[in-house]
């Protein structure tokens, strides 16, 4: 037992063995690597996770991905801003297929509480994946960042907090190609 981390069986370093996933993802691609494994080994039908909103890349949305391409192609890496990954949780349960959930520790706690009232949670949500969370920054921090480059949110085509390196740098690209 550790006063900060609580109870644990072991503590290990881990990362994706897929070099492309490891490079493009955050945190060494661990959660994407595990999610891909669960999909490709047919342990689950889909992954419920958070990704960048394709229309507003600074914003996040919850997404259901059925394969590797959908998972990593949707800017599925660290999202350091407001996100509601549980907003599709009941929709995921209603699909009546085994799935995995990737979210923050507080989201996992909410799912555990829901499982006490809805037996489908433990029957269908087979894996709950999370990493350490230090909370999230206010959205205004991201807005201040892009404004320091004289870019407005509606000009963005890509807004990446991390990835493309470990941990990778913050990256923006505008619709007219400015980086």
Q: What label would you give each PLM region?
A:
Residues 1-179:
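Iron-sulfur-associated redox domains of electron-transfer enzymes in respiratory
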């Amino acid at each position: 037992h550790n006063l900060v981390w609580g109870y644990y069986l072991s503590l290990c370093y881990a990362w994706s063995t897929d070099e492309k996933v490891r490079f493009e993802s955050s945190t060494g691609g661990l959660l994407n690597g595990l999610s891909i494994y669960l999909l490709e080994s047919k342990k689950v039908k889909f992954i419920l996770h958070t990704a960048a909103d394709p229309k507003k890349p600074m914003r996040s949305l919850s997404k259901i991905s059925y394969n590797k391409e959908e998972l990593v192609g949707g800017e599925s890496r660290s999202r350091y801003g407001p996100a509601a990954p549980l907003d599709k949780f009941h929709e995921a349960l209603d699909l009546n297929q085994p799935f995995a959930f990737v979210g923050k520790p507080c989201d996992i706690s909410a799912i555990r509480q829901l499982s006490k009232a809805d037996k489908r949670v433990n029957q269908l949500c087979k894996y709950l994946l999370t990493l350490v969370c230090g909370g999230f920054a206010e959205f205004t921090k991201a807005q201040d960042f892009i404004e320091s480059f004289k870019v407005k949110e509606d000009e963005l085509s890509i807004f990446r907090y991390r990835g493309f390196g470990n941990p990778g740098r913050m990256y923006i690209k505008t619709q007219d190609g400015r980086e």
